[in-house]
């Protein structure tokens, strides 16, 4: 008599994987919190996720350094933390206005932070910008802006901080670097190519840092949030049919079922860093997207293309940019110039 075999449906496998992942995450996030008194530097710390992280760490007894471009927003952030009674003392926070896309200013921020508090325990690279619009309407300058803020600012602060993070006193806890990347660094979202390119770069840098520094006393956590209700749409740059682009992005960024609150994200990040996690993905949709793109990259690209075709605005013909550009080639550098014409297809 033959034994009957019960077929396992792919959905059952997926459900099992999700349940197992949730169980592992629960165990990892249930470990004790980090000890108080840490010195935490947060870039982009004046609003959104940066401010939520500042509040979470302040409530744990950390001393804060907040860096951002706008000094008025930094002052407002400090007042918010004081009003919410998150800070134990006004002396526990240092505000450093700076443009971190400038390596010299990033070094100045690190030096002033160490001079003021004596050390840095945790560096959180959170500063970022968003550029939204179809590729036909995105100038090269948009990619340069995104790379400068989303990638090079983190690179500048990391390089400036590394000597301090590596030079720990015997018996001290490991230092930590936290890179706030994005699911956009795992999954190429259409109409956000400057953002996607910069976040892919940051994910690669962050994962490589973890490999190199894990056994040198510096833990690196790569954070890949999905959509969050940060209010970032108010500060995003839109190209193409700007009203339509703003509409779809704002709707997606503020739909509760698709997004996470910044407080929830800050709590997840705090726990991940305290527990030495190498990487976390925030929101179930982002977790699922990251795994699907890893298992079926071609299928994911077809689905993304379909969404672009059916759901997103068409390019603005009036604002189409000249896709060709010129390169001037020398022995030492490659810069924009007029000697060689490169056109699409070459």
Question: What kind of feature is each model-predicted range?
Answer:
Residues 215-286, 302:
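SDR active-site lid
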Residues 72, 97-108, 140:
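The beta1-alpha1 cofactor-binding region of Rossmann-like NAD(H)/NADP(H)-dependent oxidoreductases
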Residues 158, 198:
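Active-site helix of classical SDR
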Residues 46-47:
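Conserved glycine-rich cofactor-binding loop
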């Amino acid at each position: 008599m033959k034994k009957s075999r019960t077929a396992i449906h792919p959905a059952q496998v997926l459900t099992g994987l999700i349940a197992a992942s949730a169980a592992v995450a629960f165990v990892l996030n249930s470990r004790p919190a980090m000890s108080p008194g840490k010195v935490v530097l947060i870039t982009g710390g004046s609003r959104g996720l940066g401010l939520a992280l500042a509040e979470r760490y302040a409530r744990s007894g950390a001393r804060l350094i907040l860096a951002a471009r706008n000094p008025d927003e930094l002052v407002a952030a400090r007042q918010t933390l004081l009003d919410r009674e998150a800070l134990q003392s006004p002396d526990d926070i240092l505000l450093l206005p700076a443009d971190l896309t400038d390596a010299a200013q990033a070094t100045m921020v690190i030096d002033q932070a160490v001079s003021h508090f004596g050390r840095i325990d945790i560096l959180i690279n959170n500063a970022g910008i968003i550029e939204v619009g179809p590729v036909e309407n995105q100038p090269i300058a948009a990619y340069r802006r995104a790379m400068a803020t989303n990638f090079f600012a983190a690179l500048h602060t990391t390089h400036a901080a590394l000597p301090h993070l590596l030079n720990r006193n015997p018996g001290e806890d490991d230092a930590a670097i936290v890179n706030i990347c994005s699911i956009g660094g795992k999954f190429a979202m259409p109409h956000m190519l400057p953002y996607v390119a910069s976040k892919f770069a940051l994910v690669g840098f962050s994962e490589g840092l973890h490999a190199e520094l894990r056994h040198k006393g510096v833990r690196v956590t790569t954070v890949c949030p999905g959509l969050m209700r940060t209010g970032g749409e108010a500060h995003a740059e839109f190209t193409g049919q700007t009203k339509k682009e703003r509409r779809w992005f704002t709707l997606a960024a503020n739909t509760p079922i698709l997004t996470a609150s910044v407080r929830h994200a800050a709590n997840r990040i705090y726990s991940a860093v305290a527990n030495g996690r190498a990487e976390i993905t925030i929101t179930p949709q982002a977790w699922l997207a990251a795994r699907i793109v890893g298992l079926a990259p071609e299928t994911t690209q077809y689905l993304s293309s379909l969404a672009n075709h059916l759901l997103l605005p068409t390019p603005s013909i009036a604002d189409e940019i000249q896709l060709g550009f010129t390169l001037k080639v020398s022995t030492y550098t490659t810069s924009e110039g007029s000697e060689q014409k490169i056109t699409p297809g070459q």
